[in-house]
Amino acid sequence: MNWTEVAIVANHEVSPIITNLLEDYGSNGVVIEDSEDLTHDFEDKYGEIYALNAEDYPTQGVRVKAYFNEIKYTKDFQEKLIQSLKDIESLDLDLFSFDEQTIREQDWENEWKHYFHPFRASEKFTIVPSWETYQQEDDSELCIELDPGMAFGTGDHPTTSMCLKAIEAYVKSSDSVIDVGTGSGILSIAAHLLGVKRIKALDVDEMAVRVAKENFQKNNCEYAIEAVPGNLLKEETEKFDVVIANILAHIIEEMIDDAYNTLNKDGYFITSGIIEEKHEAIVEHMKRSGFEIVSINHDNSWVCIVGQKVSD
């Protein structure tokens, strides 16, 4: 089966909205090429970034690439997608462009690797592609070896970075953790590296569960993490000290009450995948459910919210 790569150039302000929209349309992977990446003063360990070819990046704004299988990507699908993009209120139509190309199956399987290099995702965590050799800087650095596949994030998205920082801040080695929508398994691995002994990783997508298990093996923690298919927290009967969910805002909205009921007293709900425009509604829902909001962090139009269950 072949794949269609769509490439959308747009202004920075709408890139999170476009990413959300593409995921809602069922994209199997999203790549963001930001014109500002060529001007940032990165630290030495990001040295790979200087080898980037400026011709591969837009001169202005961002290029968002998404991948759809050829069976799904019909003419009607394409027209609806383009119209949905043009309906974005703050889209700069003068900058906007939409292109597409067909990618063969064997090329698609390796396309995403061009964008994935070792990088420091938070104070403690460094993400390392499984096919690259990386020298740990010091004993405090915690390396997560990752082979996410095209369908799952490489950990460089702002929502993942914010979740990793929240895990550093709020997760203790004595806690129990449930990771909802685990994807590549990166957040479960992070919890394990902090010494957490009881971790459960859920995903409604069985392929995600398989990929997560493979990454758990790469990080020598398959014995410590229970990875199973699961539809949010609807059927969860166990209690946990921390619930983590880095998924889309409308899905988070569905699970807030269940997250509260799944937590032990004083437990934390760490959640991201939320665009700026939707975070206030999420915060208000969390408060109504009984959460005390302990932190709200923003990064490039994305938001990470941490709530605490302060009473039973």
UniProtKB/Swiss-Prot annotation:
It is found in: Cytoplasm. InterPro entries: Ribosomal_L11_MeTrfase_PrmA (IPR050078), Ribosomal_PrmA_MeTrfase (IPR004498), SAM-dependent_MTases_sf (IPR029063). GO terms for molecular function: protein-lysine N-methyltransferase activity. S-adenosyl-L-methionine binds at residues 160, 181, 203, 246. One of its GO terms (cellular component) is cytoplasm. Belongs to the methyltransferase superfamily. PrmA family. This is Ribosomal protein L11 methyltransferase. It comes from Staphylococcus saprophyticus subsp. saprophyticus (strain ATCC 15305 / DSM 20229 / NCIMB 8711 / NCTC 7292 / S-41). The lineage of its organism: Bacteria, Bacillati, Bacillota, Bacilli, Bacillales. The gene is prmA.
